[in-house]
């Protein structure tokens, strides 16, 4: 499949910030009423605070190592076929696209070529990264069970304190490596087939659609927690599970201590009645933490759930449904507006 190359300007804006913090409320829970989310977010996330390039890579390369200023890279509409890495020495970078003409960053890297986690179209190693109105794709073909190393990531986020607003992620197996650090996803769309959100991150997904494609066994999360003391896990709040088939699992125990919670989430009939894939390793039914809280939809019915599903109560839920889960009030900024 060919690509239309669009020669468009990538613009850099420098925003001087004296401190990468915001003053919000870590304890305020996300409201159960979906219509009140924006009011909650705007109340609890408050902002304190040229050059022209033809590729995203050129723009990122122009940012000096050890940067201490928020750099906003405005990306024009079009398809950018690039494999982009943001080094850990370049924090405070924002990739910004127009919401009505979202740029597409795409590449076809696979595990066979690069190794699984390095196959990503976008690799972020730096802290304080932000992406707004960006489409990230891995255009490699869907794994067919025959080709070795067919996993293909759209993104790997390994930096701490990263935020994604109105972004779309397309892939099949291993779409997002939510690797390490605190992360926030809001109003995003994530598509995949198997383990398409995996890693050891500590992340809050708010108002995000999880769309599963293809037939056969499908699994959304493979959280890689390795001990009860590890401070990592995925919390999905006011999200939506959609897709095809009826074999979708909310998660599986890739490692010994996964921690995944779905709250106020709409689960369609595509979710397998058991909810979570049965553990293949002995004893993992005692070490996993799979929680569900006030979810809705045909796929949320509890009658046939695996016995180790946690039906968490109001007190337990507060831990997972506030910015405190990712310590967000100390670093989270709203998206820039132009």
UniProtKB/Swiss-Prot annotation:
What is the name attached to this protein's record?
Putative pectinesterase 63
Q: Name one GO biological process term.
A: cell wall modification
What span is annotated as the signal peptide, if there is one?
1-24
Protein localization = Secreted, Cell wall
PANTHER family to which the protein is assigned, alphabetical = ACYL-COA THIOESTER HYDROLASE YBHC-RELATED (PTHR31321), PECTINESTERASE 63-RELATED (PTHR31321:SF87)
The scientific name of the source species is Arabidopsis thaliana (Mouse-ear cress)
Binding locations of substrate: 116, 151, 252
Q: Which UniProt keywords apply?
A: Aspartyl esterase, Cell wall, Cell wall biogenesis/degradation, Hydrolase, Secreted, Signal
**In which family does this protein belong, per the annotation?**
Belongs to the pectinesterase family.
Q: Where is the active site?
A: 174, 195
Q: What gene does the UniProt entry assign to this protein?
A: PME63
This protein's pathway reads: Glycan metabolism; pectin degradation; 2-dehydro-3-deoxy-D-gluconate from pectin: step 1/5
- Residues the record annotates as the site (Transition state stabilizer) are 173
């Amino acid at each position: 499949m060919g690509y239309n190359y669009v020669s468009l300007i990538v613009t850099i804006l420098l925003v001087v910030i004296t401190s990468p913090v915001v003053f919000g409320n870590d304890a305020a829970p996300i409201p159960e009423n979906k219509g009140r989310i924006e009011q909650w977010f705007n109340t609890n996330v408050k902002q304190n605070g040229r050059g022209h390039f033809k590729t995203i890579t050129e723009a990122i390369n122009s940012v000096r190592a050890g940067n201490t200023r928020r750099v906003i890279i405005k990306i024009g509409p079009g398809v950018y076929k690039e494999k982009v890495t943001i080094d850990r020495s370049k924090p405070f970078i924002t990739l910004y696209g127009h919401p009505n003409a979202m740029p597409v960053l795409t590449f076809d890297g696979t595990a066979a070529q690069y190794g699984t986690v390095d196959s990503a179209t976008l690799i972020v190693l730096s802290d304080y990264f932000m992406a707004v109105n960006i489409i990230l794709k891995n255009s490699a073909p869907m794994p067919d069970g025959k080709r070795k190393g067919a996993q293909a990531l759209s993104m790997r986020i390994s930096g701490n304190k990263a935020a994604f607003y109105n972004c779309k992620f397309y892939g099949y197996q291993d779409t997002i490596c939510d690797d390490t650090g605190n992360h926030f996803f809001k109003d995003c769309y994530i598509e995949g087939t198997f383990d398409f959100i995996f890693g050891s991150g500590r992340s809050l997904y708010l108002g995000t659609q999880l769309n599963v494609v293809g037939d056969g066994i499908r699994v959304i999360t493979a959280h890689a927690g390795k001990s009860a003391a590890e401070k990592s896990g995925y919390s999905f709040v006011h999200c939506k599970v959609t897709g095809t088939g009826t074999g979708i699992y909310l998660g599986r125990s890739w490692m010994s201590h996964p921690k995944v919670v779905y709250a106020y989430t709409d689960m369609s009939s595509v979710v397998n009645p058991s909810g979570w894939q049965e553990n293949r390793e002995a004893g993992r039914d005692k070490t996993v933490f799979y929680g569900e809280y006030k979810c809705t939809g045909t796929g949320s019915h509890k009658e046939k759930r695996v016995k180790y599903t946690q039906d968490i109560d109001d007190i337990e839920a507060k831990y997972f449904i506030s910015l405190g889960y990712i310590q967000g009030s100390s670093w989270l900024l709203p998206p820039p507006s132009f």
